[in-house]
Regions:
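Nudix hydrolase/Nudix homology domain
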Residues: 3, 48-52, 117-166
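Context-gated lysine
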Residues: 6, 23, 81-83, 89, ...
Length: 166
């Protein structure tokens, strides 16, 4: 029977000393821009209960870098290529074992979307003026959208009067 470690977040076998650490599943989320436009999508109802506008996201596969994951997920979900991938920040998801790593990227080539219909119900390009303000800034996806729309989180807070809850 494994026991809690006294020094770190892990389980330890008292007999052999084997240490087991929590499983963490890295995933990427990316805000893809084309000038003043941002790519946003909506999930299929049966895949995800979230009904708002989402960014392209997906889990990192074994042996894959974050950048490779972004290229693969963007191609799979919307049939597009991206360039100039830039790290933004990361966020642990409290309700799962996921560590979400956020990025910005730019469209590389034609903007014609080829939707992965078994995962997404729609995707489109939205001018920064068309992006709805977030009512709850509780996710890295919300932050990425507002940073694109306003240029920075500070500008978003200044313009909207929203107060950071962190």
């Amino acid at each position: 029977l494994m026991e809690n470690s006294k020094t770190e977040r892990a389980l330890v076998c008292p007999e052999c000393g084997q240490t087991e650490y929590p499983k963490i599943s890295p995933a990427v989320i990316v805000a893809i821009s084309d000038g003043d436009r941002l790519l946003m999508s909506r999930y299929r109802v049966n895949n995800n209960p979230y009904r708002g506008y989402a960014l392209i996201a997906g889990f990192v596969e074994i042996g894959e870098s974050f950048e490779e994951t972004i290229h693969r997920e963007v191609m799979e979900e919307v049939g597009l290529k991206v360039k100039n991938i830039r790290y933004y920040k990361s966020q642990p998801w409290a309700f799962s074992d996921t560590e979400m790593i956020g990025f910005f990227a730019e469209l590389d080539g034609p903007d014609k979307i080829k939707l992965q219909e078994d995962e997404l119900s729609e995707a489109g390009w939205y001018h920064r003026d068309e992006i709805p303000d977030e009512t709850m800034m509780n996710s890295i996806g919300s932050e990425l959208k507002m940073v694109f729309k306003y240029g920075s989180l500070e500008k978003f807070y200044e313009v909207t009067g929203y107060k950071d809850q962190n």
